[in-house]
Amino acid sequence: MHAADMDALLFMSEREFTYFAGFQSNFWQSPTRPWFLILPAEGKPIAVIPSIGKNALSISWIDDVRIWTSPNPEDEGISLLSDTLKGLSKRHGRVGVPMGSETHLRMPANDVVKLKSALGHVDMVDATAILRNLRMVKSDWEIAKHKYICRLVSDAYENFGNIAKSGMSEREILAAHRLDVLSRGADSVPYIVATAAQDGTDDAIRFPNDRPLVDGDVLFIDTGAEIDG
């Protein structure tokens, strides 16, 4: 951050919030309220969140939590966020935000415009490279978690022959496989696909259907499971 002349990094997506704050919640399924996490170039992280998340975030390691009363459609945290960022951006006047591939800003486009206007001479600049380079280096703890979840799903695949039978539908097979993965210790299975067709399938993304599998079908299944975020 110092080399890139950035006073702070601003995150607002579930992945970055979970990675840096260690906080997990199904509340991310609701797009009505944004959550913001700021990493200053110096000092502890700062969370700027709606009031509904105050108690839940208190169990994380983030101890500087600033809240606004929400819902408040006219100002969902923009004033509080801009004031916080301006207070941190007195040296370079630059705040880094992931803007590159595989990133997104989890806030209304109108609020992005409002935030940039409220920041005045503080510029929002792309911090994708900083984030990507950081996450490319895995700690021993992260590697252990990857090994654990990969082994868990591999064991579920080994057991797949005991689950998938001719006459079952893609939907039934998918549900049984998901339950098997969860029963082995996964926290969630947010991505799972099962498609089948005679002599193979060229569709690897659609929802499962209710057609019973018959002899000659080739079943494709893809599983994305999580443990500790």
Residue ranges and their predicted role:
Residues 1-152:
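A composition/biophysics-driven feature that prefers long, compositionally simple stretches
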Residues 150-160, 170:
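Active-site pocket-lining segments that scaffold enzyme catalytic pockets across diverse folds
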Residues 4, 156, 180-184:
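Short alpha-helical functional segments enriched in proximate histidine and acidic residues
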Residues 17-29, 126-133, 137, 168-229:
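Short catalytic-site patches enriched in acidic/histidine residues
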